[in-house]
Amino acid sequence: MKRICSIYKSPRKNEMYLYVLKSEALERVPENLLLAFGKPQHAFDLVLSPERKLSREDIHQVLENLDKQGYHLQMPPAEDEYIEHLPEELLRRNDPV
């Protein structure tokens, strides 16, 4: 089952995305979610199928959410996934001896 999907990014939260069926646009997205998400900014369109790999989402869950509720919300990664960790020697460089 292939789906043509539009993906929108949130202006309020970095790396938060909303997947919707292109044919339905934002029709089935709850109003309170849209208020929290901010004005959706179209990022791109994508053909989704069970064989397709997504970098941070389970394709089967995305397709199921699109079918059942009309949208899929991709949350930003946990903070520790994108914070660059510095080596211990750099963290202690300015410590008093």
Curated annotation (Swiss-Prot):
Domain named YcgL: residues: 3-87
Pfam family, one: YcgL
Taxonomy, superkingdom: Bacteria
PANTHER family per the UniProt record, alphabetical: PROTEIN YCGL
Protein name per its UniProtKB record: YcgL domain-containing protein PFL_1496
Organism: Pseudomonas fluorescens (strain ATCC BAA-477 / NRRL B-23932 / Pf-5)
